[in-house]
């Protein structure tokens, strides 16, 4: 099932008070397992739980702990304008703490500058003097690809494990991180994830061998409210760590994390 279809399905289910969870082991739509919903969840055997929990632990253990930089190619499609923007640049990531993405436009000018931490963000398009700042309220970032960085690049596997299922080929997990619920399924080479916080939904489909920085990894992020789509290709992972200043608030020099 394609990512857009998964998001559409999740949105539809979110509006149906008594909709049951899908019975297929890898179609766990975002819904907190409590109350009436808990009674409709498929039963998970102890073996399935153990296998899925072990696979999640191995994915988490492989996550980088040190800051790193990826050279990326992005294409951003905005259905509100019908336009598609393409650019290259770099993303500096301090896992679990902060990320800074800068895309370069014609003539080497900065086309886009995005800084995010777990509780703040700054989105800037210098060419048109556009700047937006926000915090953790999902409404602050609607229509912007903030979630792609804050969630998928900073801490894609964060959260308390609520439910897990497995077969020999695939596993699926439901994670709870604060007010957000994340549904993730993978066969180890392809990851499909949905994140829901209140009425805000976002999803990503990611192709890579595990969730470690690697050239050739690619995916598609979809913002659920306006349908903003971001296609990402990792072209290179640099061998050196980024300057700590990369993670400083751009408007407050000297505040590197």
Predicted features along the sequence, with ranges:
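Gly/Pro-enriched, hydrophobic low-complexity segments
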Residues: 164-257
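Beta-strand-dominated lipid-handling architectures at cellular/organellar boundaries
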Residues: 68-73, 82-90, 96, 115, ...
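N-terminal leader/targeting segments and the immediate start of mature chains
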Residues: 17-86, 94, 237, 244-257
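Extracytoplasmic segments of membrane-associated envelope/inner-membrane machinery
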Residues: 132-166, 173-176, 184
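An acidic-aromatic
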Residues: 94-151
């Amino acid at each position: 099932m394609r990512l857009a279809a998964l998001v559409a399905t999740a949105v539809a289910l979110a509006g149906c008070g008594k909709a049951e969870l899908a019975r297929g082991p890898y179609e766990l739509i975002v819904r907190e397992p409590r109350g009436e919903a808990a009674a409709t969840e498929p039963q998970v055997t102890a073996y399935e739980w153990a296998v899925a929990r072990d696979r999640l632990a191995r994915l988490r253990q492989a996550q980088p702990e040190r800051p790193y930089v990826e050279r990326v190619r992005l294409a951003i499609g905005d259905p509100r304008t019908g336009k598609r923007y393409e650019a290259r640049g770099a993303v500096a990531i301090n896992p679990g703490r902060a990320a800074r993405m800068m895309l370069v436009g014609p003539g080497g000018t900065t086309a886009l500058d995005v800084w995010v931490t777990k509780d703040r963000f700054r989105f800037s398009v210098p060419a048109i003097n556009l700047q937006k700042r926000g915090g953790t309220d999902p409404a602050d970032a609607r229509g912007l690809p903030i979630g792609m960085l804050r969630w998928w690049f900073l801490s894609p596997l964060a959260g308390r494990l609520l439910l897990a299922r497995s077969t020999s080929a695939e596993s699926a997990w439901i994670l709870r991180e604060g007010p957000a619920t994340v549904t993730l399924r993978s066969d180890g080479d392809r990851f499909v994830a949905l994140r829901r916080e209140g009425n805000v939904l976002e999803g990503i489909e990611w192709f890579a061998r595990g969730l470690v920085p690697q050239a050739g990894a690619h995916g598609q992020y979809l913002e659920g409210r306006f349908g903003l789509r971001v296609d990402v290709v990792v072209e290179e992972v640099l061998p050196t760590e980024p300057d700590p200043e990369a993670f400083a608030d751009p408007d407050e020099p000297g505040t590197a994390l």
